[in-house]
Amino acid sequence: RNADTITNVGSMSSPDYEKILNLNPTTLLVFSPGSGSSATTAQKAANLPGVDVVYLGLYNPNVTNPADSRFLQGILKAGYIFNKVDRATEYANWILNITSEINAKASTIPENQLKTVWLTNSPTLGSTRAYVELDTLGQACVLAGGKNLFQAPLDSTAFSINPDTETILSQDPDYIFLHTVRYTYGGGTNEPAQGIDCNDPTEMDLVLQEFLATPAYANLAAVQNKHVYLIAGDFRNNAMGGTLGAVYMARILYPDVFTDLNPQSIHQEYITK
């Protein structure tokens, strides 16, 4: 639909309940259960009589063990809600099969042959980060057989940390993945242009070159060996729950192990089906 025909009902944390009710919905899917200044699911339900307010938990994947994730349970619940149980089950099984296929091969790689990885953000996204195992990217890295060089302190709930340059240099990663975000929560855009609506790789190349031009990183193994990759924000934030990101990572990190893994084919199957 044309964006001009879609009603703006306010922010996800404090929506305009009157506008929502005027649309006569039967169901409202919420992004998070809410806390603090963000209205909870129960509060939204109290303000929307006659509307089923549902939190599916799709932003909580467990890429290494999706069967135990709120993400996969959310897919199955959505199947019941929208009377698409067979389709939801097929999708859930598809994700489980991909995970099993990758894990079966990654688990055979000896510890001393694991590729070391730094999962960071592109230069356009502010201060330098390292995404840890709690984050979707960190989980995708583990499934793909990568050894994430950065971890959060014990009992931390952080998805990333901010390592200093000295620490990064001392870790000297074999591979670096730069997380990029095109569309923001506020509806804005970041460079580089990417995704289905992008046919020109110029901005992607400029962002990559900006990172590679960082003097402090010039002698890192990943930079020297041209093992620095942009990874689209969709592989962290979209409805694949990080699994597709793991597919690409596995093929990049271990092309000789995952010889029959075709990321483009799997990606196309996801889009088509």
Task: Mark where each language-model region is.
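Short, solvent-exposed loop/turn elements at domain surfaces
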Residues: 1, 30, 125-130, 238-240
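Acidic/His-rich segments in extracytoplasmic proteins that coordinate ligands and/or metal ions
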Residues: 1-81, 159-209
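Extracellular/periplasmic catalytic domains that process cell-envelope and extracellular macromolecules
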Residues: 2, 21-22, 46-48, 108-113, ...
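Structural recognition of the beta-strand scaffold that forms the well-ordered cores
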Residues: 27-31, 52-57, 115-120, 139, ...
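Extracytoplasmic substrate-binding proteins
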Residues: 41-126, 160, 223, 227-273
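Catalytic-loop motifs flanking and including active-site residues across diverse enzymes
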Residues: 133, 137, 242-245
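His/Asp/Glu-enriched short active-site or ligand-binding loop at hydrolase and phosphoryl-transfer sites
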Residues: 134-158
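Active-site/pore-lining binding-face segments in mid-to-C-terminal subdomains
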Residues: 172-247, 251-252
